[in-house]
């Protein structure tokens, strides 16, 4: 068994590309080898800022011989009166066999021509020479470039190639325009700590040889060293380091030989909000912040950076990094002090100079719309005047920090600085918290807003964006969603579910669409598109986030206007019904009533009873009963009416299920008992009466879900 190494050496690669390329190569190499009937013992993919490498262990010297049975054309097309046709000749020629090798065999679809073909295994090195460069040139990512006079695209110029089959060079040639790069056994060590070439004598020694040249090619090992180094450095200065996952993942692919270095900042900068300091450190400088071990709310006047340089020069490295961050923090300090000189409300007029979207006006216009929608939501929730005032102030000020100097310089601090400046301006803490929280959740893994102001204003902001962008016809399609509208809709639904907010989303969408058309008379109403979009988001969230079976989700959302309206009118109810259905499927209750309800619903579809009718009075004529099973079913339906009404108004669907379960034996008698009836009786009045009985049963079940959408399990 052999070991093969391919290393592609480059100029400094973007950190995000290194991580993405490693993931792509793992998948691509595995599938590629499988496609060529090669099964190695292991595949390792490595990456640093200057190289990507694949190390394949336990490769056979060649493919195994294999026999394949290949199906050809139908026998009727391949042979006419016992003689081969052009179809048979073409099939034989394509497979490289004589006509005599063709066999006719029966299949489920008739007789077909087959050939038993033996393929000799090819040498593995020969196959690799055809495949390996394609693994790299097919990589996907952003910010690709061309260099020299060639058309080859890669994030950075490729400078060297290593290709080793055990201890021998496996020749490869990368052509780029007039340039040509031939693979060998020469790699490169660390740019600073090991200047010059590194000779690789054997593919199996790749990792160790480069470690001796101060390059750790394994990103997992680099991460372990970084984590250990940062923790140790923080402990030495009496602190604990913050290590955000995103920052750690990026830093891992910024260095080849990581060393943790501690630097200092002036204590005066600690007057800045913690978020400003950590944003400068993490987002702009890729440093790790350090909190006081005794008081985690406080930052130490220190930072930890991961150096790719000489560990012996850590003091020089720390000083250089310190000068850079001090300049950034000094700017932040100036911005913060200048911004605090003004009341947050005084920034509102400046929003008139900030465009939200060309056809949708300024950010000041958007704030006005957010205020209006937020008050509509507050009215729906029946909030107190005090809560309404807090929401109104939050909505008015929620975007004011966008034009402050701090947020202009550090956009990622929007909302955070709004909260700080609101407190400095003397606004109520609830308003300040709402300004920050209205942006939550910022992504799928983020925390949710906990204050009414944050919840309501956040919904108002997102609803305005959705209605406005949909009104312009910019509806998400496929993977394209430049305005993050799916995330906005998900946030509205998730916040409502989490906080138990009984909002009428249908009414809000209708009013929003109406207001949009009033403001843009040349545009058509986006209402239907918005309704459909939100139903899709509810469906996705119930399945993917709540873990509800797909058919149960379909059952609560239905496929008609009644269910759509109900889902949008009462978001809490649709979530509750889906969760309840899942619970009674899991505990077996659903199975006990499924057949009864479904059979009734299918027959009821042949009648004309409206789906909103629950009371037998007026739709059932007891004088038309011929059997006791009809009378008992009627009596049971009469008793079920108050139960269903309670279930609907109080969302106590267990009562409804209990009522349906109690009625199930009566329904079974109606269909199959000694006093069963023929539903589709010849007498039209009798037939309608019996269909209406079943229709009423269906309608009671529909208060919970459309049982016709449920798949029997």
UniProtKB/Swiss-Prot annotation:
The keyword Aminoacyl-tRNA synthetase applies. Keywords: Aminoacyl-tRNA synthetase, ATP-binding, Cytoplasm, Ligase, Nucleotide-binding, Protein biosynthesis. GO terms for cellular component: cytosol. InterPro entries: DALR_anticod-bd (IPR008909), Gly-tRNA-synth_bsu (IPR015944), Gly-tRNA-synth_heterodimer (IPR006194). It is an enzyme of class 6 (ligase). PROSITE patterns: AA_TRNA_LIGASE_II_GLYAB. It is found in: Cytoplasm. Tetramer of two alpha and two beta subunits. This is Glycine--tRNA ligase beta subunit. It comes from Picosynechococcus sp. (strain ATCC 27264 / PCC 7002 / PR-6) (Agmenellum quadruplicatum). The lineage of its organism: Bacteria, Bacillati, Cyanobacteriota, Cyanophyceae, Oscillatoriophycideae. The gene is glyS.
